[in-house]
Amino acid sequence: MSSTSPNLQKAIDLASKAAQEDKAGNYEEALQLYQHAVQYFLHVVKYEAQGDKAKQSIRAKCTEYLDRAEKLKEYLKNKEKKAQKPVKEGQPSPADEKGNDSDGEGESDDPEKKKLQNQLQGAIVIERPNVKWSDVAGLEGAKEALKEAVILPIKFPHLFTGKRTPWRGILLFGPPGTGKSYLAKAVATEANNSTFFSISSSDLVSKWLGESEKLVKNLFQLARENKPSIIFIDEIDSLCGSRSENESEAARRIKTEFLVQMQGVGVDNDGILVLGATNIPWVLDSAIRRRFEKRIYIPLPEPHARAAMFKLHLGTTQNSLTEADFRELGRKTDGYSGADISIIVRDALMQPVRKVQSATHFKKVRGPSRADPNHLVDDLLTPCSPGDPGAIEMTWMDVPGDKLLEPVVSMSDMLRSLSNTKPTVNEHDLLKLKKFTEDFGQEG
């Protein structure tokens, strides 16, 4: 760089001030200054530095300052527990002289480990989601594979001895909105003796160098301590994409730790199932893909499953749809995902409300009282056309709150909502998913 940029100058000033505070023994102040300096240096590398030589020089300085910051962090942490001799700049802290025993016997007393495990406690699902297998329409193959991997080993452990072992890694992949996360909720409900960890990338990615892989390690450690356990990682592609030259060092280290922990070398991974979900399985790293022994394609629902979804989403709401209507809706929604059908039904449920809003006439009808549904009354008001016998000209603002009887959801409401809702899955993505299934997966 021909001239020093303001950000680079700021980084140099911060690093210089950090070194001064370090020498003066103000280690907490020095630690903060080192960390701020590194942030400025990294900004310069990413957005301002010209030429590989300049970048290499700045990266070397960053490594040096980060190493010193880690030592100060370790020293300050130990100082809280007991009085220690201050470290001189450039000298290893007492903790470093003992060597890195993070995998040793004393790890259980490590406050850093406890802090990381406390962070992960929020990922444990304490309250079971109330989703049963029967609430999941279709996907029989996926349900059977999950029962085989999760429910059977808990209920009949004697079946899985010797060479017959349950699956330890299952990948659910398919278009968005097909029920992958919903299936995981059903697993959490049905496997009521298991500890269920629901993880997203934000739970495992930290801004501090080296902390993300520690979080991954501690996640698996927690799972081993709470066996039988299920680790569900939604959108796993955001954590375990293919390795490339462009990815950051932090991402590479997280991936490596995942591979080590899923392989389970030197540790007992019995009783732990890793359940992953993704919409774009082709971006997964090949080594991660291999760790998932079962790779199950969750396709778009079949017509009978789509018909069942319309029923499930309508629930107990008053409607006039017949079995034939549900079958017709199932046929008309080819290419729609479960999430798309959910949106169609939600929109259809609003159609009676819109009729109330736009009505210019109401008529009196007989129906259940709002105060006591078992008691029928004759003075309820429902929207009607101006030509209906008994039509009264009024708007919804004139209707008393406890006297409105909204129209039931009808087939015409469903068809109107269907015409306004387009599928969210395109043909190109489906072809890629089918190709991946042919190469690596199995049908769900």
From Swiss-Prot:
Family: Belongs to the AAA ATPase family.
Subunit note: Proposed to be monomeric or homodimeric in nucleotide-free form and to oligomerize upon binding to ATP to form two stacked hexameric or heptameric rings with a central pore through which ESCRT-III substrates are translocated in an ATP-dependent manner. In vitro, associates on the inside of a helical tubular structure formed by a CHMP2A-CHMP3 polymer. Interacts with CHMP1A, CHMP1B, CHMP2A, CHMP4B and CHMP6. Interacts with VPS4A; the interaction suggests a heteromeric assembly with VPS4A. Interacts with VTA1.
Protein source organism: Homo sapiens
Keywords: ATP-binding, Cell cycle, Cell division, Coiled coil, Endosome, Hydrolase, Membrane, Nucleotide-binding, Phosphoprotein, Protein transport, Transport
Full protein name: Vacuolar protein sorting-associated protein 4B
Subcellular location: Late endosome membrane
InterPro entries: AAA+_ATPase, AAA_lid_3, ATPase_AAA_core, ATPase_AAA_CS, MIT_dom, MIT_dom_sf, MT-severing_AAA_ATPase, P-loop_NTPase
Tissue distribution: Ubiquitously expressed.
Catalytically driven reaction(s): ATP + H2O = ADP + phosphate + H(+)
PANTHER family: AAA DOMAIN-CONTAINING (PTHR23074), VACUOLAR PROTEIN SORTING-ASSOCIATED PROTEIN 4B (PTHR23074:SF72)
Annotated domain remarks: The MIT domain serves as an adapter for ESCRT-III proteins. It forms an asymmetric three-helix bundle that binds amphipathic MIM (MIT interacting motif) helices along the groove between MIT helices 2 and 3 present in a subset of ESCRT-III proteins thus establishing the canonical MIM-MIT interaction. In an extended conformation along the groove between helices 1 and 3, also binds to a type-2 MIT interacting motif (MIM2).
Effect of residue 58 to M: Induces thermal instability
Membrane topology of the entry: Peripheral membrane protein
Outcome when changing residue 66 to D: Reduces HIV-1 release 10-fold
Record EC number: 3.6.4.6
Organism lineage: Eukaryota, Metazoa, Chordata, Craniata, Vertebrata
Residue numbers of Phosphoserine PTMs: 93, 102, 108, 410
Entry keyword annotation includes NAD: no
One GO CC term, this protein: ATPase complex
